[in-house]
Structures are given as structure tokens and as C-alpha cells.
Amino acid sequence: MTLNLRVLSPNRVIWDSEVQEIIISTNSGQMGVLPNHVSLVTAVDIGVMKIRLNGKWSTMALMGGFAKIDKDRITILVNNAERDVDIDLQKAQETFRRAKACLVQAEGKRQVIEADVALKRARTLLEAINASPSDSN
């Protein structure tokens, strides 16, 4: 059995095909979804989604949103997302370095929160392509 997975951002359809299983990051932790999953709606955290298709795993960096699961149909609405094959390693590493520097220089609560979110997004891009953020120092 398979699941119909659709990942949509405001600008484009990022994924629209059958998969065997997914694992997503929610605000309360990671959640695995298999065929005939109970119906629910959940917030999606900034994090890596793992997708199993034809017995192989791939990943996608999700930048927050919502997921609606209805038995064998999953619709994920995200602010932005990038498939692992579309992420440029050097660009992701540079984004991580800049985000880290911004966090160090942040002054005031708002700047710290914004810099922390930017760092989490940058780290997620690296994790989606299996590059350790510590490799980007």
C-alpha cells in the first residue's frame, strides 16, 4: 500500500506522488505516517522530512507549516521546502555560517529569536543533505 503525498508552498508544488512512508517533524516531536494512518491535522516544525519511496529514503527540508493526514492522503502546506537533491551544499554551509554569526551579534529579544529561527532553517538544510552543521564552522 502507498500514501499520496503532496507538499505545497505558496509558490509551487514541491512534491506530488505516491510514497510508502514519511517521517515529519511536528511541534511535539517526530511522527511517522504509514498507509491507513488515523486522520489528523498537525503543525509541522522546521525540520527534515524523510520520505520512503521504492524502498529508498530521501529527505526534504521543511520550513514550517501544517499537515493534513486523511488515511492514505497527506497534504503538507509549508512556508518553504527544498528537496535534498535541490540543495546546494556550499550555499547551505555559507547560509549556516552567516546565521550563526547573526545569532552571536543579535541584540535584544526580537533579534535573538529571528536569528535563532534563521539558524534552525540553515541547520535543517544541511541535515537534509546529511551534512553535519559542525562541518560548517
Curated annotation (Swiss-Prot):
Principal location listed in the UniProt entry: plastid
Record bears the keyword Nuclease: no
InterPro entries to which the protein is assigned, alphabetical: ATP_synth_F1_dsu/esu (IPR001469), ATP_synth_F1_dsu/esu_N (IPR020546), ATP_synth_F1_esu_C (IPR020547), ATPsynth_dsu/esu_N (IPR036771)
Topology of the protein relative to the lipid bilayer: Peripheral membrane protein
Gene3D superfamilies (alphabetical): 6.10.140.480, F0F1 ATP synthase delta/epsilon subunit, N-terminal
Database matches in CDD domains: F1-ATPase_delta
Keywords, alphabetical: ATP synthesis, CF(1), Chloroplast, Hydrogen ion transport, Ion transport, Membrane, Plastid, Thylakoid, Transport
Subcellular location: Plastid, Chloroplast thylakoid membrane
Gene Ontology MF terms in the entry: ATP binding; proton-transporting ATP synthase activity, rotational mechanism
Annotated transmembrane regions: none
GO cellular component: chloroplast thylakoid membrane; proton-transporting ATP synthase complex
Self-association and partners: F-type ATPases have 2 components, CF(1) - the catalytic core - and CF(0) - the membrane proton channel. CF(1) has five subunits: alpha(3), beta(3), gamma(1), delta(1), epsilon(1). CF(0) has three main subunits: a, b and c.
Protein family membership: Belongs to the ATPase epsilon chain family.
Protein task: Produces ATP from ADP in the presence of a proton gradient across the membrane.
PANTHER family membership: ATP SYNTHASE DELTA/EPSILON CHAIN, ATP SYNTHASE EPSILON CHAIN, CHLOROPLASTIC
Protein name: ATP synthase epsilon chain, chloroplastic
Origin species: Pinus koraiensis (Korean pine)
Primary gene name: atpE
